Amino acid sequence: MKEAKFIFVTGGVVSSLGKGLVASSVGALLQAHGFKIRIRKLDPYLNIDPGTMNPTQHGEVFVTEDGAETDLDLGHYERFTGIKATKDDNITTGKIYHELLKKERRGDYLGKTVQVIPHVTDLIKSFIFNGTEGLDFVICEIGGTVGDIESQPFLEAIRQVNYTLGKQRVILIHLTLIPYLAAAQELKTKPTQHSVRELNSAGLQPDIILCRSEKEIFDNQREKIAKLCNVSLSNVIPAPDVSHIYELPVLYSQCGLDTQILEHFHLSKPKPSLTEWDQIVHSIRHPTQEVTVSIVGKYTEFPDAYKSLVEALNHGAISNKVKVKINWVNSREKEEKPIGEKLQNSHAILVPGGFGDDGVEGKILAINYARTNNIPFFGICLGMQLAIIEFARNVVKLEDAHSEEFRNCKHPIVKLAGDQDDDLGGTMRLGAYKCNINANSKMMDAYSNTTISERHRHRYIINSDYKDDLEKNGLLCSGISEDGTCIEAVELESHPWFIGVQFHPEFQSKPFSPHPLFVSFVKAAIDKK
C-alpha cells in the first residue's frame, strides 16, 4: 500500500500572501502529473469554525458538500483541483481544543496532566494523517504567519511529522514577501531572512522558498536568499503578481515549482498536461466583449466576502468568452434615486446571500429596479427571499410582506426553518440537498436536468402558504426540495431572465466546469447588452 507524501505550506512576513492559491496550484500541477492528491487547511484561530465570523474579518464562509462551514481557501482547493472538500479538510485551534476538552471530561487521558505537547499536537497530527490512505500527496496549508503565537502548536506538530517521516515523505514550502522600497528603488530580502529564522526557531527548515513580489526578482537576490536561508538556489522560486489567479498553475510550472517538488521526493517527472489551464488563460486574456454585472450587497468594500461568487461569474464569463466587469453597489443606500443611478449601466444585477436587516431595503430597491426595467436578475439565498418579498409587496399587493428574520409582520413570506435554537453556530440548513426542477422553466433550460443537488447555508425558508398567490401572479416556483417542503427556486415568467435560488450555486462552479446558472446568467447579460 502506497504511503502519502506531505507538503506543508507556511507563510511569512505578512498575511494574505496567497498560501491557499499556492496550495491549490501545487495540487493542480501534481494532478496534471497524474498523482492523487488532497488539500487541507489548518487554521490557528480559536473559533470552532468561521460560521459565525464577520465576513469583513474573515471573508466568505465556504460550505462543503457534507455541510461544513470552512475557510474560503477550501473554495480555491475545489476550483483548482475539482476535488470536493469535506469537513475533514479544515481544522481550527477551537475545534482541536473542543475535542481535547471532551476527551478530558470523558477520562480518555486517564488522569494525566493535559498539555499542549503532546495532547494538542497529537490531535493536530491525527487531523493531518486522517483519511490519507491511497493518496500520493497531502498538501497542508497553515493559516496565519510564522511568528504568530497561535501558530506554535501547529508548527510543533509539523516538526514532529517531519522528524517521524523524514525528508523522503515531507517537504516544506515557505511563501514570503520580498517588499519593494520605492525610495531606495530596490527589493529587500531582510524580512524573508527573519521569517526563515523564525521558522528555524520552531525546528523547521524550508525546502522551497516562494518569493512573492510586485517587481522582478533577479538572480543576485535569489542567490542572497539561498545563501542566508540555507536553501539551494534552484529552490528559491519567484512568485510574481499575476492579473488573474488562473494563470498561477502555468506560471509555477514554468518557474519549476512542480519539478523541484518531484526532485525532492526522487520521483519521475512526466511532462504535465496543462492544456486545459492554457485554454482558460487564453479565454481570460482574449475576451470578445465586456458586460457589466452589478453586485448589490452590504459587504461590497470587502470583495473576499463574495469570493466564490466573483469566481463563479468569471467562470460564466470564460464559458461565454467575455469579460465580466463587476460594479459593486452598497445596499445600505436606501434612497431609490441613488440606487437607480448606480444600476443604470448594468447589463445584469445580482443580489447575493447575507444575514441581518442592515441593507435589506436597499437590496429590495435594486430588485425592483431589475424587475421593472427587464434587466437580468439573479438572487441567491437572501437575494431570492428578498426578490419574493419585493414581488409580494408590489405585484401581489401584500404591502406588509417581509421576513420573520427581520420583524413581525402580517405577511411572513419568509419563515424560520423547522426547529431552531438560539445558538447561531451549527444550527442552519447546511450542505448538499436535492431539488426537483420544473420541466418547463428557465432553470430546466440551464441545467438540462429535472433533479439537481446544490449546497445550502440558511436558517430561513420561503413560506409555502403563499405559493399559490405567487404563482397566480406570475412568479413560478421552479425548484422544490426533494421532500417537497422547501421552495428552492423561483423565476418570473414574463421577464427575460429573473431567477432566485435558495441555495449557493457559486460553491460548485469551477473554471473548467462552470456552473450552468452562471453561464446562463452571463449569457443573459450579453443579450441585454
From Swiss-Prot:
Keywords: ATP-binding, Glutamine amidotransferase, Ligase, Magnesium, Metal-binding, Nucleotide-binding, Pyrimidine biosynthesis
Residues given in the record as ATP binding sites: S16, L17, G18, K19, G20, L21, D73
Family matches, as Gene3D superfamilies: 3.40.50.880, P-loop containing nucleotide triphosphate hydrolases
Region annotated Amidoligase domain, chain positions: 1-267
Keyword tRNA processing on entry: no
Residues of the active site: C381, H504, E506
PROSITE patterns reported for this sequence: GATASE_TYPE_1
Pathway the protein takes part in: Pyrimidine metabolism; CTP biosynthesis via de novo pathway; CTP from UDP: step 2/2
Amino acids binding CTP: S15, D148, I149, E150, K188, T189, K190, P191, T192, Q193, K224
A Gene Ontology term for the protein's cellular component: cytosol
Residues reported in the UniProt entry to bind L-glutamine: G354, L382, G383, M384, Q385, E405, R459
Entry-linked NCBIfam families: PRK05380.1, PyrG
Function: Catalyzes the ATP-dependent amination of UTP to CTP with either L-glutamine or ammonia as the source of nitrogen. Regulates intracellular CTP levels through interactions with the four ribonucleotide triphosphates.
Protein name: CTP synthase
Gene (UniProt): pyrG
